[in-house]
Swiss-Prot record:
This is Protein sat1. Transmembrane segments: none annotated. Residues 247-266, 272-291, 442-502 are annotated as: Disordered. The gene is sat1. One of its GO terms (cellular component) is cytosol. Residues 463-494 have a biased composition (Basic and acidic residues). It comes from the Eukaryota. Restores G1 arrest under starvation conditions to sat1- mutant. GO terms for biological process: positive regulation of TORC2 signaling; retrograde transport, endosome to Golgi.
């Protein structure tokens, strides 16, 4: 372990792919009463994938795993550090145990440090180690801050922790001290989400057959290897606080660019007032602006083409927010959503209009499933959906004698975002289930009767009183229930069965009458979920101590 503390500060809780990842890395000497000498400090971003061998053919990624390990060995050879001790000793064992408990990993060389991963980890993103500082001396209580800025590739797989697959990303900071030859690596988890424009309204599999899919979505069979150097700058604590804005909230990109242009303009005016020639001052100002424009074009030209293609695909199939639920050629209700995309922590408003008089209860729930392309999955689509299905929020309402109903649900913060890669994806659905009483006379008459005539011929209140009377008098025999169960057990496009006091369905509709002949109609509506971006408060000032290594 090192004698200094390592902390990392981020302006936001998530980083979008295709944008710049920016953070402040701070080294502080708080443990030693003497000067601490750090020979080498470096930083790198690692992204790894973990697969479940029960649901995914892991053997398809063996070559990817070997290639990623080879790239780690190639990209981690900054310096060669001799091993601490080649022989086994109790002290080395205790040091390793203590290091694992405190979230640090020790290795003799940088190559060994890069290979200290789990065996089933498959690399998806590797960046070259960027040197933060060399031969740094920290006196007791002194701190050193470095600003790191790197562009995250647009085709980076987002961070996700699921059942069939997991994607994890971390900022790895390595420290080599003079008192200890072992290289210590600190890992800070970072969350990468899909780009705002990288969400076309197409289900998984549609883009996999597209010729442009290799340019749009992450191909996990080919890990991303970034060899470009990141922007490293040593900054003071005060400058770091200013860059992150007041109370640790970082200024936006536009505000920072506007502030830079304002300072350049003030310097240019000052040079003119001091008597310098207009040509020299103006030429320098114009050349600098032209160089910055050229650099921006080179960096963002390729990403802009990809985003433009994504927008083109998105405009072809916009998602609907108005649906009609039908059964046997009759509209049971109309469902309205406030919008087709929701952010985590946002309220989802749902309205039901024109409910059928026979509908007794409505159940709605937000759920997510993991999708795997057929080439690498072990089970079929139904088995994979059952194994990976998660319910995030639900609501049940009684709608007896109601024509309209409004409901709201809050999308939990821990709900993952909707995303897609060429091999995997996560989709979200709003599952709606209607519990509808069965009327034999009405079934024989046909579905063309309007609502008002149905109420006149057999009012809902009289039907309800008749059912209560039948239950109280006990005239519902087992033979009648068995006969109705046989008739209601047939499925004709919907999930149809008998509803009783103990309903064994997955939806678990409750508060129904004791016994009555009924059917359940289910439907799933596709929606999209996005992660909410939260600006970190108090950043490098006051109470926040920064992100600690895991």
């Amino acid at each position: 372990m090192t004698e200094c503390d390592v902390q990392m500060y981020m302006p936001v809780n998530v980083v979008q792919s295709g944008t710049d990842f920016e953070c402040i890395v701070k080294f502080t000497n708080l443990r030693s009463s003497e000067d601490v000498n750090l020979l080498l400090c470096y930083a790198s971003i690692h992204g790894e994938m973990y697969l479940d061998y029960v649901l995914v053919r892991v053997t398809e990624f063996d070559e990817v795993q070997r290639q990623g390990l080879l790239n780690k060995r190639t990209m981690s050879g900054l310096v060669h550090i001799p091993k601490v001790s080649s022989s086994y000793s109790v002290i080395n064992t205790l040091n390793g145990m203590i290091g694992n408990l405190f979230g640090v990993k020790q290795a003799s060389t940088l190559t060994e440090a890069s290979e200290q991963k789990q065996e089933n980890a498959i690399p998806v993103l590797l960046t070259r180690p960027d040197i933060l500082g060399v031969d740094i001396t920290l006196s007791p209580g002194e701190e050193k801050c470095f600003r790191l800025k790197r562009r995250i590739p647009l085709r980076t797989a987002p961070t996700y922790k699921g059942l069939a697959f997991r994607f994890q990303h971390a900022l790895v900071i390595g420290v080599q001290s003079a008192t200890n030859n072992a290289c210590v690596e600190h890992e800070f988890e970072i969350t990468i989400v899909p780009n705002v424009q990288q969400q076309p309204e197409l289900p998984l599999g549609k883009n996999s057959g597209n010729r442009q899919s290799s340019k749009l979505f992450a191909d996990l069979s080919k890990p991303i290897i970034e060899t470009d150097a990141a922007e490293i700058e040593e900054v003071s604590a005060e400058k770091a606080r200013r860059q992150f804005g007041k109370n640790g909230i970082r200024l936006s990109q536009d505000a920072q660019e506007e502030e830079k242009q304002k300072k350049k303009y003030e310097q240019h005016i000052k040079k003119l007032l001091d008597g310098e020639s207009n040509e020299e001052g103006g030429g320098e100002f114009q050349d600098h602006g032209m160089r910055s424009e050229i650099n921006e074009e080179v960096l963002e030209e390729e990403d802009e083409e990809k985003i433009a293609l994504l927008k083109k695909l998105e405009s072809k199939q916009p998602m609907a927010t108005r649906f009609e639920i039908t059964s046997k050629q009759k509209v049971l209700c109309r469902l309205l959503l406030s919008k087709s995309r929701y952010r985590t922590g946002e309220m989802m408003m749902i309205e039901l209009e024109g409910l059928d008089a026979m509908v007794r209860q409505v159940h709605m729930q937000l759920e997510s499933v993991e999708r795997i392309v057929p080439d690498i999955r072990i089970r079929n689509s139904v088995g994979t959906e059952r194994a990976t299905r998660k319910v995030w929020c639900r609501i049940t309402r009684g709608v007896f004698e109601l024509e309209n109903m409004s409901a709201s649900m809050v999308v939990p913060e821990e709900c993952p975002e909707t995303f897609e890669t060429q091999q995997f994806g996560v989709e979200h659905f709003l599952r709606v289930e209607l519990l509808r009483a069965v009327n034999k006379k009405r079934e024989m008459q046909g579905p063309a009767h309007p609502r008002y005539s149905e109420e006149v011929q057999s009012p809902s209140r009289s039907r309800y009183s008749e059912e209560v009377q039948r239950v109280s008098e006990g005239r519902l025999s087992e033979e009648v229930s068995k006969e109705e169960e046989k008739k209601g057990g047939r499925e004709s496009g919907q999930h149809k069965r008998m509803a009783s006091l103990t309903n064994s369905r997955e939806m678990q509709i409750q508060h129904a009458p004791t016994t009555f002949a009924a059917e359940t109609i289910q439907c799933v509506l596709p929606i999209r979920i996005e992660k909410r971006v939260v600006w970190m408060e108090d950043g490098m000032e006051g109470g926040m101590e920064g992100m600690q290594p895991v």
